[in-house]
């Protein structure tokens, strides 16, 4: 199975933070935090999967898939990491300390007032909580993440210097920037499709 995701990253008080979402209580396969993604649907590009899944799993808090694409373009582009057939699209986002609170409160309200079968069968409400994690928290709180995602966290930690360089460059420009596999990450100004 090929899958793709988005992962917002920011700098706050000089520290890097990644925004992750926690699977809802009905998830049986692997509980815990991860990024915002899922499997590529038939005929869909990897990058469009990332936009769609990101907008769905964030319940529109960053907008629909077109809005997510525009946000990423506005912020300067992506840094892409791949692990097996899982493609992570990291992008810079301005820090918003209230975003996790608003998302979680909204989820809790809807979760308590809607039919659980409807929620379980929906593409929405997959995440019950979102949270900013610092680099240090990624090292010390791996146990809070989905089991398959721990290897991906190790990949982030191994590549943190280049991710930091990417974030700093994307804050000021929209240049193409190489990823950890010596391929080029493309901004959406320079690339169509996925």
Stretches with model-predicted labels:
Residues 8-10, 20, 90-94, 131-134:
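Short, well-ordered beta-strand micro-motif
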Residues 27-32, 88, 98-194:
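Nudix hydrolase/Nudix homology domain
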């Amino acid at each position: 199975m090929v899958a793709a995701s988005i992962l917002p990253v920011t700098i706050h008080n000089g520290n890097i933070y990644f925004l992750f979402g926690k699977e809802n209580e009905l998830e049986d396969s692997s509980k815990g935090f991860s990024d915002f993604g899922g499997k590529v649907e038939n005929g869909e590009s990897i990058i469009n999967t990332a936009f769609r899944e990101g907008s769905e799993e964030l319940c529109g808090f960053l907008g629909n898939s077109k809005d997510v694409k525009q946000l990423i373009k506005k912020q300067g582009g992506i840094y892409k990491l791949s692990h097996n057939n899982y493609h992570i699209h990291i992008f810079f986002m301005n820090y918003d300390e209230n975003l996790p609170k608003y998302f979680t409160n909204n989820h809790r309200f809807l979760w308590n007032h809607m039919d659980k079968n409807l929620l379980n069968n929906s593409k929405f409400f997959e995440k019950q909580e979102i949270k900013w994690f610092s680099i240090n928290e990624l090292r010390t709180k791996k146990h809070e993440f989905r089991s398959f995602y721990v290897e991906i966290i190790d990949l982030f930690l191994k590549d943190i210097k280049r991710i930091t360089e990417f974030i700093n460059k994307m804050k000021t420009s929209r240049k193409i920037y190489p990823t950890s596999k010596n391929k080029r990450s493309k901004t959406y100004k320079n690339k169509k499709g996925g």
